[in-house]
Amino acid sequence: MKRTSLLVGMLLAATLAFAADAPSPLQMNQKDPSKAPKIYVIPMGLDGNGQIGSDIRLSIYEKVAKDVKEKKPDLIIFQMESADGKTGKTYLGNDDRSEKGRIDFEDARKMVDLLKLDLGDIAQVMWVKDSVGFSTAIALAWPDLYMTSNARLWGMSRVMEFVRHPDPEVVRKFLAAWTGIANGFLRRGGYPPELGLAMMRPEKTLSVSWNGRNLVWRDDTKGTFLVDGDELTVANFDAKTAEDLGLCDGIADSVEDLMFLLGYREWDDSLCKNNQDGTKIVGDYILDWRKAFAKSTESFAEYEKFSADPKKMNSAKQALERVRDAMKKYPAVEFRWKSERGLSLDVVEKLLLELKEKSKSGSGGGGGGGLGGR
């Protein structure tokens, strides 16, 4: 009996040792599974700046994708950090309205296509450090999703802001369109429409039941576990709840933790350590466009001041041209202007044309005037 127990113990120890040394399933899909995988981190938002539409948009990830193809990593880690202006950890916490995002679904769809399809031959995971609002739809476009222990995976309650209309039938059509498009991102990650609707529409409830090991999402309160029974708020998840319900595959507070969860025991992080992955590209971009936006606000203030003086029409024109140039160089600058004050590139071009006509006619004064804040 003792010999049998000893033999079983030895077999168990050998099995565990083999499992510990076995390569990750992701590593087995590499061109050379025997090689330690080279990792490449792509931030979606960084160091507290993660506005959808500006910090996170297609234009910068086109540059990142090109770099990925040159560096040829074996694993891409998408790192989501987008708070949608919610600086507090409670749902009704302090909001920074200037940092609220407004998703351009076409831009976001092209961005996800670029990252998932054009780079689809490389293993990918989504690692959420924080996700509030529309960034959650983007994060859930990836089936392999992990979170940090204090991460939020909050819903998209602001959808309701964009469907307001006095005609209920128009609201119904707008709402169906918005939620349908947003749920398209979730479908790409393999998540059910019931989840997406509950994360966008406050009146929708959400519960889950289990069919064996399979989780069944329900758009009612009759499931085994009630996720969201409040008809006044959308469904929000913290990391622990998301893990318990299978929304995220595990909790990792560092890249090292994440790699262990993925089954890797060794990896090549030289790109990360040498600042050669997407972190530098995205970080430089965020810094540059935000500087350009700050300078454009100064230039627009100069335009408003000079345009009222017939003798300074040329100075007004030069100031406004700087705003135009910033918008052309960084679509994020135009996005921010449109979000905050309704000023688009088309409007700036129109104002420049008006200044040109006034200069020709010799008239002046009463220039473009101010734009109302939002």
Predicted segment positions?
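Bacterial N-terminal signal peptides that target proteins for export
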Residues: 1-8
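Charged, glycine-interspersed solvent-exposed loop segments at helix/strand-loop junctions
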Residues: 159-281
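Bacterial N-terminal signal peptides
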Residues: 8-17
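Terminal-region recognition feature
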Residues: 19-130, 134-137, 141-143, 147-150, ...
